[in-house]
Amino acid sequence: MADVKIGFEVHVQLDTRTKLFCDCPTDYEDAEPNENTCPVCTGMPGAKPLPPNEEALLIALEIAHMLDCEPVLDRPLYFQRKHYDYPDLPSGYQRTSVPIAVNGELDGVRIREIHVEEDPGRWEPSTGRVDYNRSGVPLIEIVTEPDMRSPEEARDFLRRLMQVLRYSGKVKGDGGIRVDANVSVEGGARVEIKNINSIKGVYRALRFEIQRQLNLMKHGREVRRETRAFREDQGTTVAMRSKETAEDYRYIPDPDIPVFEITEDLWEKAVARAPEPPHHRARRMAEEYGISLEAAEALVTEREWADFFEEVVEKAPDDWDIEFIDQWVRKEIKKILNKKEMTFREAKITPEEFIELLELVREDKITRQNALNALWEAVDSDKSPVEIIEENGLLKVSDEDRLARVVEEVIEENPQAVEDYKSGKEEAIHYLMGQVMRKTRGQADPEVTMRLLRERLDSDG
């Protein structure tokens, strides 16, 4: 197997109300082109930026904590101008902070450093049009060490990272992910693949690029240190330019942005606001509740799903076993949501309503199927499962006199099934059972019904 080293620079938009250095709104998706702009985010001469958006810094620190990073505390920090010439960068430079947190780790991949920077605008090369609504939206940049050894490892890491970022609740849903992937093979030159905008795209780009470099080496050709672009339609990478160094970007401190510090108070505030990271939460839940790590990992794929599970466990009677709750929360309700293409965030049922339903199941007052039917309707309804059960009369019918009358009707209406049963065909009684269930709309107690059917059929000899 080839000796491969892969590292990432991952960029994701932070969900703030205003941009990083001005008061323009960050909600640009539904805006007209260049509607949410001002002289600062369009790089007008003489325009002076505001001090850095503190909420953006705070969110970045929350995410740094979730990635087990150390804050760069109590020392002067500043924003730099990273110079390059592109139509979507009106000032000719991008403002990016020096590292605000370092030395993190996620699933065995070291996080070298975290920065905050401003997003450039949107340029459409085919038309030449530039929309600066996005210009100045705050980004977090997460830089890893080259610790991944295959496209599969890289893909798994990005999936986990995006899970952590979504868990924070502080990244923009429409901002997506933009990845610069650095890859070297067999100790050769490092090649950067710029601006890949999906995890699937990163995986495909890495597979192609690794094979490209191996093919060059096989034929004795040099792998050049360069920057390449991923062509999604072809699944290939193409050369853009020779690989830049820090000197090429002509980094200088931005004289218009005041120096700032990350104080202990600011860091403690970020830590207090940050949710428990999903990878930590899964380990804790497995240990605390005695469920498998695999089950816990499934629950934490959605923050609201894990929240729901833990709240049900907390509020349910003490004598309920975890296996029962796990079966209904992790499997049954999730199965329904998947079929309806819903997330837990969209589900309308509350933990209290769910517990009421499970109480009926545990007390054997409703059949499992009718409980599932009520749950199916409740997840996207304003009615609770119990309200649906009461409105539709879905509780079990255990009254033997009533059930005996229904059994008698079914036997009279299905003489062929009765004859089949008496000739030894056991499946016939299950057919008759189904007819009783149909007449009672699934409310008949299965055990009582089966006993009454056998007693009635066997009594005829």
Swiss-Prot record:
Enzyme class: ligase
Keyword set includes RNA-binding: no
Reactions catalysed, as given in the entry: L-glutamyl-tRNA(Gln) + L-glutamine + ATP + H2O = L-glutaminyl-tRNA(Gln) + L-glutamate + ADP + phosphate + H(+); L-aspartyl-tRNA(Asn) + L-glutamine + ATP + H2O = L-asparaginyl-tRNA(Asn) + L-glutamate + ADP + phosphate + 2 H(+)
Database matches in InterPro entries: Asn/Gln-tRNA_amidoTrfase_suB/E, Asn/Gln-tRNA_Trfase_suB/E_cat, Asn/Gln_amidotransferase, Asn/Gln_tRNA_amidoTrase-B-like, GatB, GatB_C_1, GatB_Yqey_C_2, Gln-tRNA_amidoTrfase_suB_CS
Molecular function as annotated in GO: asparaginyl-tRNA synthase (glutamine-hydrolyzing) activity; ATP binding; glutaminyl-tRNA synthase (glutamine-hydrolyzing) activity
A Pfam family recorded for this sequence: GatB_Yqey
Function, as annotated: Allows the formation of correctly charged Asn-tRNA(Asn) or Gln-tRNA(Gln) through the transamidation of misacylated Asp-tRNA(Asn) or Glu-tRNA(Gln) in organisms which lack either or both of asparaginyl-tRNA or glutaminyl-tRNA synthetases. The reaction takes place in the presence of glutamine and ATP through an activated phospho-Asp-tRNA(Asn) or phospho-Glu-tRNA(Gln).
NCBIfam families: gatB, PRK05477.1-2, PRK05477.1-4
Subunit-level organization: Heterotrimer of A, B and C subunits.
Protein name: Aspartyl/glutamyl-tRNA(Asn/Gln) amidotransferase subunit B
This protein's encoding gene: gatB
